[in-house]
Amino acid sequence: MDVRVRFCPSPTGTPHVGMIRTALFNWAYARHTGGKFLFRIEDTDAARDSEESYGQIIDALRWLRLDWDEGVEVGGPHAPYRQSQRSSIYRELIEKLTASGHIYESFATGEEVEAHNIALGRDPKLGYDNFERDLTDAQKAAHRAEGREPALRLRVPDEDLSFDDLVRGEITFSAGSFSDFVVVRPNRQPLYTFVNPVDDALMGVTHVLRGEDLLSSTPRQIALYHALIETGVTTFVPRFGHLPYVMGEGNKKLSKRDPESNLFHHRDRGFIPEGLVNYLTLLGWSLSHDRDVFSIDEMVAAFDVGDVNPNPARFDQKKAESINGDHIRLLEVGDFAERTIPYLVAAGVLTEPITETQRAVLAEAAPLVQERVQLLGETPGMLGFLFAEAASVTIEDDARASLPANAGEALAASIGALELVPEAEWAHEAIEATLRDALVETLGFKPRIAFGPLRVALSGRRVSPPLFESMAILGKAETLARLVRLSAALG
C-alpha cells in the first residue's frame, strides 16, 4: 500500500514551530517512501479560524519548500480539502452510521451526567458511562417534547483497544477507560473527533503522524475507524505515530506566548529555510549520533518515523542559530548576497530598486561576512557602513569606549601613509602592507592597538568585515574621509 500522510492544521494564530515540525516529518516521510503528502485545513471553528492564519500557514510551508501533492490550493481527487466545505459529506456519513446503529442519540447534559454519577455513589467527574445507549423511542419522544435536541455518540467496543504506535510502541487502552463519545453536537455540528478520522478514511490516509497531545484521542478515533470499516466506508485503520512535545526554556512545553514558538520570528531574524528545516528535524530525529548539519535531501533519504525519539525535544535557540550559520556558509556566495537584500532593505541600508553600483559593492562584500554571520538579520549591521557616506557613519558607544589612548596617533600615521598609495594600486594587499609598515614596524604598535581605531573610523563598530578588504571596497577617498573625520573628532 502506498504511503499517504497528511497535515491538517486549524487556521488559528501564526504558525507554531511544533505545528511546522509535524508538517515537516509528514512531508519527509512521504518523500522518503515515494508516497503522497496531503494538506488539509480544519476550519470548522468559525469563532477562531481566520483567512489571515490560513494564508500564513501556506506562506510558511512554501517558504520552507514543503510542497504537497494534494490539498488546498493544488486540488486533488478528494476535494474539497477544507472541512468547512465538506458538510454534506459528513451529514451523509452520520446518517449511515446512525442507521447502522454505530451512532445513537444522547440527551443527557453535563449536569445530568454528574447527577447520574452521584446517584450511583461515584465521583461526579467520572464522566459518561454509556447509560443512554438503549433509550426507547418513548424516552426519546419525551425528551423532544421538552424541547431538547440530542447529541450523537459513537458506540465504542466494550474491550481493550491496542495499537502499535510508530514512535512509542505498543499502547493499550483498557476496556472502560474511554466511553461512548459525542461526535455530533445537539446543534448538528460534527466534532473534530468525527470529521478528522472521517476525512482520513475517505482520503486513504495510511499513516497519521501528529503531536503527542493528541494521543489520548486515538482510541476514540480507532473505534470510529472500526465503525467505518463495518459500514464499508474504508477497509483499514491507519498506522499512528505520536511525535514528542517541543519544549522551551526551563523544560516547559513551548507555548504560543514564547517568541521562539513563532515560525516567522525566526524568518524575520534571518534564518534560512535550509537551516531551520535542519534544526526542526533535530527536534525528535537525527541523521547520526555525530552529525547535526545535513541537507534536506540527506534528511529525506534517511528519514524513518520509526527512528523518532519519543522523549520531549527542547528548542535550543543558540544551537538553532549555529546550525543556521553552518547552512549560510554552504550557500553559493551569489545566492547569499541575494538573500541579504530583503534584510538590508528592511533596515534602511538599501532602497529598492538596487543600483548596479550597490550590487557591485554587495558582491565584493558578501564573501567577507558570509563566514561571520549566523543570521541574515546580522548583515545590515555588518554591511551598512559600506553603503553609507562618511558623514552618516555613527560611532557606536562601545566602539568609542574601545579606542586606546594613542588612537589619534594611529589615525594620523594611517592617513599619512595611505595618502601615498596610488589610486591604481588601491587594493587590500597594498593597503595592508602600507599600514603594517607605518603602524606596526615604524611605530611599534601591536596590531590590535594599531588597527582597532581604523575599524571604528570606517564602520562605527568594534566588529566589522575584514579591515583592509573593507578599505578596498570603500575606495581611497572615502577611506581617508572616514579616518580624517574620527581623527578630527578626537582632537
From Swiss-Prot:
Cellular location(s): Cytoplasm
The reaction(s) catalysed by this protein are: tRNA(Glu) + L-glutamate + ATP = L-glutamyl-tRNA(Glu) + AMP + diphosphate
The UniProt annotation places ATP binding at: 256
Molecular function per GO:
ATP binding; glutamate-tRNA ligase activity; tRNA binding; zinc ion binding
Segments carrying motif 'HIGH' region: 9-19
Cite a single Pfam family from the UniProt record: tRNA-synt_1c
Q: Which domain of life is it from?
A: Bacteria
UniProt keyword annotations, A-Z: Aminoacyl-tRNA synthetase, ATP-binding, Cytoplasm, Ligase, Nucleotide-binding, Protein biosynthesis
Which terms does the UniProt entry file under GO BP?
Answer: glutamyl-tRNA aminoacylation
**UniProt main location, coarse:** cytoplasm
'KMSKS' region: where is this motif?
253-257
User: Record's GO cellular component, any one?
Assistant: cytosol
Query: Quaternary structure per UniProt?
Result: Monomer.
- Name the PANTHER family for this protein: GLUTAMATE--TRNA LIGASE, GLUTAMATE--TRNA LIGASE, MITOCHONDRIAL-RELATED
Give the family, as the similarity comment puts it: Belongs to the class-I aminoacyl-tRNA synthetase family. Glutamate--tRNA ligase type 1 subfamily.
Q: What is this protein called?
A: Glutamate--tRNA ligase
What is the protein's species of origin? Leifsonia xyli subsp. xyli (strain CTCB07)
